[in-house]
């Protein structure tokens, strides 16, 4: 019996796959529990259309992320922080600070996507990675200056 899995099933397959299972397993376990649907022509066609729509959406998100990465790479942020002698900061610069500076420039980026390569505890120039999409990262220059 051919079925289309609705959810991931251990030792059978992942959601969206068309798999061949024994008639009893399909009819008595997978179908009643809503883990799969029968692989009729209409269901297979609907699955293929859904996959195409998801792929198109994924491509669009990737293009938008690449455009955003290009804009962010040309950006330079200046953060004014309280600092003591020798440029040592009282505290450190966090992803929240960078998020707020980006919001001021018109970019709405979640702080979870901002990754520091090193701890920012002194004044100077740093580069921060912003993960926009799987495989798309932008480097933003951050100048930390004393108030």
Swiss-Prot record:
Provide the alphabetized UniProt keywords. Ribonucleoprotein, Ribosomal protein, RNA-binding, rRNA-binding
Record bears the keyword rRNA-binding? yes
Please name one Pfam family that this protein belongs to.
Ribosomal_L9_C
GO terms for CC?
ribonucleoprotein complex; ribosome
Q: Does the keyword Ribonucleoprotein apply?
A: yes
Q: Name one GO biological process term.
A: translation
Gene Ontology MF annotations: rRNA binding; structural constituent of ribosome
The job of this chain, per UniProt, is described as: Binds to the 23S rRNA.
What family does the database annotate? Belongs to the bacterial ribosomal protein bL9 family.
Q: Could you tell me which NCBIfam families the record lists for this protein?
A: L9 (TIGR00158)
This chain belongs to the protein called: Large ribosomal subunit protein bL9
Which species is listed as the source?
A: Thermoanaerobacter pseudethanolicus (strain ATCC 33223 / 39E)
